[in-house]
């Protein structure tokens, strides 16, 4: 469809035992070049197949630092760096979760070659998209655009993929392999929760400041 550009953003999920002896889940993405890029907070991106980067907040909560080893599926990986994912400012495993969990759930990225190996066992077909007309003016416009896109996706799924670019990208969809989730950016808690929470905190702090000024004026007035 001419209105959007679709990007594969596949991932696999693996578990490992943390230093607290509890099971941790990592959502591991393929190396990204175009969308949902990473910010390197410490170390470097993986260069070798036995290297991995993980979210900095998840790493801090699990006392993991650059250079540490993680054993996943019987293979030992070196944490080459700590990063911040632009699409995971908070660790929501599912968009419907009431609260994020950055202790037991984190996101990670390996090399393209290692991702191919990991994805041989299981793979989640996740896609991202951008609007070719640019960013929507506000949440109202984005909702309209995303609703229109959803209608197109449903039509493509019903036709088993179709001949369009969108249909080709979503050609894996059929009666037995449908859409599990559809989350536009404005409704994505993992992307927006931190900013929304900061905004609500600002309002609370301003209210507290006004009350404090009133109390001080009463005491010293």
Question: What annotation goes with each model-predicted range?
Answer:
Residues 1-221:
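Membrane transport/envelope proteins' first extracytoplasmic loop
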């Amino acid at each position: 469809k001419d209105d959007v550009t679709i990007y594969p953003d596949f991932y696999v999920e693996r578990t490992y035992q943390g230093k607290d002896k509890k099971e941790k889940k990592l959502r591991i993405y393929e190396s990204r070049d175009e969308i949902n890029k990473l910010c390197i907070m410490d170390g470097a991106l993986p260069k070798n197949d036995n290297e991995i980067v993980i979210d900095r907040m998840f790493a801090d909560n699990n006392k993991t630092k650059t250079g540490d080893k993680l054993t996943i599926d019987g293979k030992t990986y070196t944490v080459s760096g700590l990063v911040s994912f632009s699409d995971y400012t908070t660790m929501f495993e599912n968009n419907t979760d009431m609260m994020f969990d950055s202790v037991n759930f984190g996101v990670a990225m390996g090399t393209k070659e290692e991702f191919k190996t990991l994805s041989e066992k299981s793979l989640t077909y996740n896609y991202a998209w951008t609007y070719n007309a640019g960013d929507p003016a506000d949440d109202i416009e984005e909702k309209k655009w995303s609703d229109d896109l959803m209608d197109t996706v449903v039509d493509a799924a019903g036709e088993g993929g179709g001949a369009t670019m969108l249909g080709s990208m979503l050609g894996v969809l059929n009666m037995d392999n449908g859409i599990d989730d559809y989350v536009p950016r404005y409704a994505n808690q993992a992307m927006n929760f931190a900013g929304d929470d900061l905004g609500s905190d600002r309002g609370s702090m301003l209210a507290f400041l006004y009350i404090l000024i009133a109390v001080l004026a009463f005491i010293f007035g």
